[in-house]
Design a protein with these regions (language model features):
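Transmembrane alpha-helix interface/packing and boundary motifs in multi-pass membrane proteins
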Residues: 1, 23-36, 111-116, 210-222, ...
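Helix-loop-helix hairpins and the membrane-proximal interhelical loops
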Residues: 1-11, 86, 93, 144-249, ...
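Membrane-embedded alpha-helical modules
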Residues: 64-180, 291-444
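Flexible loop linkers connecting adjacent transmembrane helices
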Residues: 34-62, 87, 96, 186-189, ...
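Re-entrant/interfacial helical elements at transmembrane boundaries that shape
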Residues: 1-4, 21, 32-52, 83, ...
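A structural-propensity feature for long, helix-poor, extended segments
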Residues: 17, 21-33, 249-274, 278, ...
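Membrane-interface alpha-helices at helix entry/exit sites of multi-pass transporters
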Residues: 11-15, 52-69, 239-252, 280-283, ...
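Membrane-embedded alpha-helical segments of transport systems
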Residues: 22-27, 68-80, 88, 132, ...
């Protein structure tokens, strides 16, 4: 739909892009919660908490809470864009290649350590995701890697193909091998704003997660994945019931959705102030700017302030309209869980393959998606983590490019962390890993002493 926006007025075209993207971020939580299939790649973590809540008969509560958290993150992000854009834009350029590499590495470390009791498995699946991300042309010399002489692998493995395979197609396989189940969808009971009232009980998690989303959105190349895993890990570490995470924790759901939806508006801070796109959405917005001869940067706030204000208003209105529509239509959306599981499995399978094929009109992509579907099916049956594969693919590519760029500019490993932000991130990584090692060692000692005493 991007080319269609070129014929529209700049603010109308940008509003259309923001509306489509924002709606997908909100709406992506719906299948993630109801049928364990993320609507977008960044809703993958929502399945961890949303699906178990649905299985407990709390689908309405999960959806309402997800909408509320998304609205909180979105509005908070827009408020930061409006109030703090001149100040916050100065921070983004301080993140060079070294800082972005360390931020991405921190994201990988946190997602691995957040899988309690499955740290080794999460580490292995993260490494597998990183390896998948290296298939194709390497980014500096453009030589082929791990293509095994197959030309169709030269373009790499598309992230969307992997996401649909690991989550949607694998879930379809699970539904097809199960006996038909009929669930009765509960009504919206409790009013349209029940989720907002419940969100007040998790206001600390919502506020911190939204802040993580804003901070990560401002850093070019980091985005939703790092933000949601930082938020999710924070919520888990500070929760009074960390054992509930992965089993339908409202706190985990709030953390994931608030962080996701705080990123897009925050990514516009470096775009508007410096002309630097922070992620895919702002890269598309930049093309709309150029088509209409709008030059983002400090001069934008002086020469076209009315355009900037209109963009702010559009962002706020979009958040209100999307969440209002979703809250009103929740009863209808809940009817999805009344569909017999085998029929639902076939529907997911068909829609997934149609979606994969439509990406590049490639039957090979469908075969790759099917392969990852089988892998996801096996991992789910073995109760092994899947999300680290996606994070490894996304952050692994960022880490490689930034590491290679950084190493060309430093003379020794010590120089890699000789800047303040890089040093702080490095220390945080050491503290996080050290704390986990210490915790694991103490747990081992206690277990050993109790077994000796017994």
């Amino acid at each position: 739909l991007l080319p269609a926006t070129f014929s529209l007025d700049p603010i109308v075209g940008l509003t259309a892009l923001l509306g489509i993207y924002g709606s997908s971020m909100y709406g992506g939580a719906i299948p993630a919660i109801l049928i364990n299939t993320p609507g977008t790649a960044v809703n993958a973590l929502t399945t961890y908490e949303g699906t178990p809540m649905t299985r407990r008969g709390e689908a309405r509560r999960a959806l309402s809470l997800a909408y509320s958290a998304s609205f909180c993150g979105g509005v908070f992000s827009v408020a930061c864009l409006i109030a703090l854009s001149p100040v916050l834009a100065k921070i983004a350029p301080m993140f060079g290649s070294r800082e972005i590499f360390l931020a991405a590495l921190l994201g990988i470390v946190l997602v691995i350590l957040s899988h309690r009791g499955q740290v080794l498995a999460a580490g292995m699946t993260s490494c597998f995701g990183i390896w998948i991300g290296t298939i194709g042309l390497e980014p500096v010399k453009y030589s082929q890697r791990y293509t095994f002489g197959q030309s169709w692998l030269a373009g790499g493995v598309d992230l969307i193909v992997v996401v649909l395979g690991l989550f949607a197609i694998s879930q379809a396989f699970l539904l097809l091998v199960e006996d038909d189940k009929f669930s009765k969808a509960e009504g919206i009971g409790g009013g349209l704003f029940a989720g907002f009232r419940e969100l007040l009980r998790h206001k600390r998690v919502a506020a911190v997660s939204s802040s993580f989303g804003v901070a990560m959105g401002m850093i070019p190349g980091v985005g939703e994945f790092t933000a949601q895993f930082l938020s999710y890990t924070y919520a888990q570490k500070t929760s009074e019931a960390p054992e509930d995470f992965g089993n339908g924790s409202p706190e985990g759901l709030v953390a994931s959705e608030a962080a996701n939806n705080a990123v897009p508006a925050a990514a516009m801070i470096p775009l508007l102030a410096l002309g630097i796109p922070g992620e895919a959405l702002t890269a598309m917005m930049l093309s709309v700017f150029y088509v209409h001869s709008v030059v983002p940067g400090p001069q934008l706030f002086q020469s076209q302030l009315d355009f900037v204000v209109a963009l702010y208003i559009a962002l706020l209105i979009l958040n209100v309209l999307v969440v209002a529509f979703l809250l009103v239509s929740t009863n209808q959306l809940l009817r999805v869980i009344e569909i017999p599981t085998r029929f639902l499995g076939v529907a997911i399978l068909v829609l997934s393959f149609v979606g994969v094929y439509s990406l590049r009109n490639s039957a090979i992509d469908c075969a790759i998606a099917a392969g990852f579907g089988v892998l996801g099916f096996a991992l789910k049956r073995l109760s092994l983590p899947i999300v680290p594969i996606i994070l490894g693919m996304v952050l692994g590519g960022i880490m490689e490019i930034k590491l290679r760029t950084s190493m060309m500019r430093v003379d020794s490993p010590v120089d890699f962390i000789n800047r303040p932000i890089a040093f702080i991130l490095f220390v945080i990584i050491l503290i996080v890993v050290g704390a986990h090692v210490r915790s694991a060692w103490l747990k081992y000692r206690i277990g050993k002493e109790s077994s000796n005493g017994g």
